[in-house]
Amino acid sequence: MNKKVVLSVLSTTLVASVAASAFAAPKDGIYIGGNIKKYYSTDVLFEMTPQAKATYASELNAMASDFNNVVFVDYKGKGASIEELFTKGSKVALGEPLKKEDFADLYKVVNKDGSSTATEDARAKVDPTPTGDLNVESVSANNLKEVVVTFDKAVDADTAGDKAYYTFTANKLAVDKVTVSGKTVVLTLAAKAENQASYELNVDGIKGLVKTTKEVKFFDNTTPTVAAVAAIGPKQVKVTFSEPLSAKPSFSVNNGAIAVVADNFVEGTKEVILTLGAQPTASTNTVTVEGGADYASYKVEKVTKDFTVVADTTPPTVSVKKASAKQVVLEFSEDVQNVQDKNVVFYHTTKGHEGYKGTILGVDGKEVTISFVNPLPEGQFKIFVDYVVDNGTQISDLWGNKLPEQVITGTFAADTTPPTVTKVEAKTNTEIHVTFSETVNGADNKANFTLKGVTGNVIPLTKAEVVDAAKNIYKVVTTEPLNGGSYYLTVKGIEDASKNKLVEYTATVAVADTVPPNVKDLDPATPGTDAQLISPTKVKIAFTEPMDKASIENKNNYMFNGFNLDSKVTLTATDSNTAVVVDFTNVVGFNGFKNGDAISVGRVLDTAGNPKTEMQTKVNLPNSVSAPLFDKAEVTGKNTVKLYFKELIINAKADDFAVDNGEGYKAVNSISNDVVENKSVITLTTGNDLPTTAAGVKVKTVGEVDAKNQYGVAVALTDVPADDKIGPNWLKAETVDTNNNGKIDQFKLTFSEALYVASVQDSDFRIEGYTIAGVETKGEVVTIKVTELDIDDSDATPTVAVIGSVEDLKRNASGPFEPQKAIDGVSAPDKEAPVVTGVEAGKTYNTAVTPDSADKDIKTVVLKKDGKELAGYALKTPISENGSYELVVTDNAGNTTTVKFKVDIPAEDKKAPEIKTVTDDKVAVADAPKWEAPKATATDDVDGDISDKIAVTYSSEDAGSKVTDLASAQTHLGTAGNTVKVTYNVTDKAGNPATAVSATFTAI
């Protein structure tokens, strides 16, 4: 069992135990038995010192071979050994009662600093093992579509009602529906069984029941009968049969006196509702049934049954039958109608709130299943039956008795147990089946699975898909067939319906070897298949898998340039029989390989005896010694790079290598050389930190290199890029107040690189003193939304903990992390009202106005005209209609500015003013020097008397005259017979010009 996985399971599972326990014992936490005998409470596990955590981890490692002696207890008092959690799955294991023998006699109670000052007697606090555990008394089948399972006592309705817990050996039959009543369970099959055939029924997963297998023989030699007939409405009659029918019978009411206008028969039903054309008036009536057939092809014998019609005046009732996080099953007291009418609405928690509105998934008899987008609150919850229109269609029984609007209560215990992998099995050399403990999401996404070989190489997958949803079985499919041997499948990113995230799980998968071996190309950069020249007289030929030693060392399986190998040539299997060294050293006259030399490899065998497919494979031989075969480089830690070679490397030293962290090459501090499958994995430790994205990280060899392969050839690397195999680092947490009201409503967590969104869940975080309402991930930032407190917490810097793991975009995981104090990112509460410009309180404007504000946190703007709100008004919108206005501007902090003003813009003036006519006149020559043109008068409908605005011009049509103004006009009139024309013009304020008026004056 993978210790790392176990430690992660323990850490993550305990998150569910934070809630206050309602039980006296056993206390929640981890009980380590064996020779250790220590009890770690949930609170202690979350707040231990680093030294105490290290001790805890070492103790778990010490118990890795005996996880039956490590017991986990949740806050509800449910518990199981870690071994049981892995082998049975958490849903089954935690459903079984704890027993005294699960615990040691006394445990030392561990404090946060790792010390122990008290003891805990968990064994004494467990109820004695109950007698009379649940048993299956009998299994029978009286027809070909139903199986009756009888228990020795009433069963747990939730687990007994799950069809996934009933399976038939060899999957010959499948259960479609389960009906639970006391200690009897009726299974309805998806397809009929064969008559007189026997099957094995497995019952496993029901609370209190050990897995039970019973033989059930299907033998149907009886005709179906009419079990009951009842009036369920004024025009509805229900006919119940003794078993499911495959074909519909005929029905007649009162010998045909009342027509049957419709029925709801479907194949496989036991109940048929007849809709009549008229309401029976007699107290006693008859239904005649004939024909139809059961699944053994026996017909219903003709029979006439009486039924009485008694008016029902009692309205139906409804209650909660079953509830999960986002789904509720309601059960009515009788058959009802109109449940799915658009006038019928269901809510939970708050009536009328769209976020709590339900969607009907289906109606089955008297039951309706409703789903919700937002989950139910834990504990007691409310379901509201509401009607959109009071006088609209309502739920009623078939007699028309209406169900009134009402509130139904129920109890929901939130699922806090993460799903587990219960089985991993290779079905073929391209398919691996994975079984989960419960219904999960994400198991059909191949990105949530990683398959590796024993050397750590990643095996490409083509897809992941469901095999059997009812049994939670999925499969992953490989791109190429797998060679025989062991592989490692890692599963992560999976969650159940309650958003509980699967702890990363790795399983060893054994695959039978049916794949033929082949020769491996050791130089993919050149055409053809190439060997490795390890010395002037030796070549290494590699294979795709471990080979039969005798086969690859047999000279008869090789030819050199078309001829049999010289008798002096030796063949030696190497690299765990995945390669062979062909040595020409002792061949007389051999001076080395030339261009074009090749060795042909025949049908050598792998360890399973599979021969190579091709009769001969030509392998090209280099004419110069090859550098040691290198595979890849990976950044695996803050200061570590791993180099993977395809062969054994010896004498490697730190000064053989340099690492570039993106800022230039630097020397390596130290190295380690691990050998896996006779191939070296060299770990380089650097002094400079490496980016978690591996961006710009490169490796090269420097100077005189001591690192060589077993044939004495030095390693040669030039600017080799390193892949990203390191998870993200958590940099900081910062408080946020989005509405600037002095209360924290978000925490912004920044990581060293962009995160894979699906890897981040609410349950990955804890914040001291705050309730998490949701998370959002964008790039490297995780925004945690929290419920605002009722106090001013703008200066708070609570402790933030990342208790789960998060992944980068390449699915590299990190976490949990050490808790951090949040950085104070919240300013003091905003108490300053918005500043409104463009209008002033109390002013009246005779032109259009445009209110505005430079504040950036405006939340609402309300404008009223003459007391009535103008919907949709926004700042910067001109106001040009006359009226009395009230403008209310509110910022995010709730500060408000109110401005009252008026707009009174005069009506547009389009009428020209009028000038009163001035009459022509005569002027005596003697009076000319003092003459002035008579005054004219002008009026305007808007501006009034505008006589003072009249403009006067002077002119003369006399020959040679130069009259332009009053003075020249006076001079001109000094001669008898001369004339002067005076013209009067005026324009009102709106720019409308009057019609000009003229008068002519003649000198006499």
From Swiss-Prot:
InterPro entries per record: Cu-Rt/internalin_Ig-like, Ig-like_fold
Transmembrane regions listed in the UniProt entry: none
Keywords: Cell wall, S-layer, Secreted, Signal
Lineage top rank: taxon: Bacteria
GO CC aspect terms: extracellular region; S-layer
Signal peptide: 1-24
Location in the cell: Secreted, Cell wall, S-layer
Quaternary assembly: The outer cell wall layer is composed of subunits of the outer cell wall protein. These proteins form a hexagonal array with a lattice constant of 14.5 nm in the outer cell wall layers.
Function statement: The outer wall protein binds to the middle cell wall protein.
Record-given protein name: Outer cell wall protein
Source species of the chain: Brevibacillus brevis (strain 47 / JCM 6285 / NBRC 100599)
